[in-house]
C-alpha cells in the first residue's frame, strides 16, 4: 500500500506525534529530500530559499536535470522514501511525469506546494500522494486558499502548513478556526532565521498551536558536537544532482545569510558528490556535526545523539 494512501487514515495530530518514533523504528530506511527546482512564483519576504537568498541563482533552470536523467539516476539509490520540496516544485514542468515513473522500489512520502497552479496540474499525478499545502498570506487570501484546498481534497490527501512569522502569529488562532470549519488540518512551523527570535510572549502563543513534531525551537548558538545519521539514511538531492547530507548543509555551503555563522568552520563534509557520478555512494557511518541543526525537515529525518566527537566518525 502506498504511503500516500495510508496517510488518509491517520489523524493529523497522531501523524505528527508518531513522526520521531517512526524514524527510530525504521532507522535504516533511506529518506530523500528532493529539490527538482528552486524556482518559485512567490517571493515571500521571510523566505530564506527564494527571497532573502535566491537559490535559483545558484541552481538556475538550465542546471535542472531532465526527467529521463532523473529516472536513471534514482535507480542507483536503495529503496527510499522521497519527499519533494522547492521552490515551487510544480514549476518543474514535468514533475507529474517524473513522479508517475519513479522506480517502483521508491515510495513518495509527499510533495509541498503553494497550490497556486491549476488543479489540473495536480491531477496529472496518477499515484496516491500526500500534498503539504503551504499557506502564504502575502500572496493569497484565506478564502481563496481554502477554496483551492477544498477543490484539491476531492482527489488528494491534503494538509495545510503555515509558518509562524511575526506577522502570521497573531492571526493563527483565527486561521486555525476557519480551517477547522472546513475540516482542514493546519500545521504550524516556527519561523527559523538566525537573525530572528521570538519574545517570551510570542513563544507562549506559539506553543498553543505547534504540535509534537515542532515543539523545540532552533538554538543558533548550539555548536555542541552531534552524532547525526544524515548522509547515511537521509540525503538532500539538488536540481543538478548534487547531494548533501542535509538542507542545513547546502544552506551553510551556498547561502551568504549564514556566512558569519559558519566562518572558520568546516562545511565540506556536508557535500556527498553528485548522484550522476559513477562513484557516488551513501555514507557508511554517522557524521559528527558541530553546527546548529536549523531545518525541521532535517530533524524529521535523521537520528541525532548529543555526544563528544569520536575519532572513528566523520566530523563536520
Name each model feature, range by range.
Residues 67-84, 92-178, 185:
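Radical SAM/AdoMet-radical enzyme domain recognition
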Residues 34, 38-41, 222, 283, ...:
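Processing junctions and N-termini across compartments
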Residues 24, 123, 225-227, 281:
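Short secondary-structure boundary/capping segments
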Residues 14-30, 50, 247-316:
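Flexible mid-to-C-terminal extensions adjoining Fe-S/redox cofactors in radical SAM and related proteins
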Residues 130-260, 270:
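Radical SAM enzyme [4Fe-4S]-AdoMet core and its adjacent flexible, acidic
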Residues 86-87, 115, 231, 241, ...:
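Glycine-centered flexibility sites
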Residues 40, 44-47, 228, 241, ...:
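Short cysteine clusters
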